Amino acid sequence: KYKLAVKTADAILAKAPEHGETVAIKGLVLFSMHEREEGLRLTKLGVRYDLNSFICWHALGIVHRMDRNYHESLKCYAQALRIEGGNLNIIRESGFMQLQMRNYLPFIDARLVLLRTQPHLRSNWVALALAHDLAGNKTQAVRVLAGYEDVCRDIPKHCYEYSEVVLYHASLLEEMGDAHGVLDLLETQKAHIVDEPSSNAMRARALSTIGRMDDAAIAWFAMLERNSENKAWIQAYLDVVATNESRLMHLLDLKCKFPKSTMIRRMILHVAQNADFREQAREYVEYALVKNVPSLFLDLKSLYSQPGKKDMIEEIVEECRIRWDPQTGDEGHGPPSSYLYAMYYLAHHYSYTGQTSRALLYIDSIIQHTPSMPELHMTRARVLKRAGAYEAAADAMEDARLLDGQDRYLNTKAAKYLLR
């Protein structure tokens, strides 16, 4: 209610035109209303009228902070604290300014004052620990968090805030290389930890660090039973149980145990070579094409940098296209959508490999069959853009936009292509 605030301030100033605090607050309000120059002038004038008012200095500090003049803001907060040293709001805000300026030691002092004044607030404990962490003193940060955990009583069940404090404590111990401390803390606070996946991951990493590889493998496998699509967990499990030569064997074993995991099957393609790759890629590609996965090319594009894999993928998709072609009269061909998505993949593939004419042949055939899909016209536009035909690409993107005029993404892309 900025207008009402200005009106009230004007009413006061009509009777006391040199009342510094009112002038400063009016300047702060005007600054918040984007009247920057007038707001800054009035705030400084308010300080000049009443140099001994912490409110005037506080208002000027806020204005400088909003103006991102953090150095001047700190000076104003320091002056306000000389006048009103026990004001917690000013102490808190000055601490934030010290943090903004990367002055970690004064930030620690500010947070320590707040903690001593309000030790019942969890945020003060965590903020002090974070201040020590940012200053590079992780040992002191751990001591602060341990002190907080010692004074906590009657912790309710499923208290996510307390759980996060414990996990932050564990992460600091992990960064310090104290794997035994991580295990002890997680075991002691097990009943209060809500985020079990993060806790289990820390525990598994700690077990690996101290050399208990069998226990670490069991821990990682238990996590894969919970979520077999997490690439980081799969990678960590392989680092524990497999060498570079045996990674494919262990991945195939995981594939048998988690047959629905797409991530495991995708990681197999990265590791497998030659005949093994062809076999696994055929299964992966056919499954994705039958499921009509439009992002298949983006998924497999990273494999093209590995020798021979690009050509094998091309052969597999071409074989699928020929086998599923409805014009062959083969009764065993797949659904029409699979044939179209095979051609859709090949259009991306040939455009990426520089065979523009073949890419256009495939994408034009799909558009002739299904002209109402904006994605097909967008792909045609990308093929033409990659070939350097910017005007034709803009026309193709405009065709895509006209199919759904309310789609902001299509409108933006069409405008971008026209600008190009």
Region roles according to the model:
Residues 1-420:
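Non-TPR docking regions that flank or precede TPR/alpha-solenoid scaffolds in eukaryotic proteins
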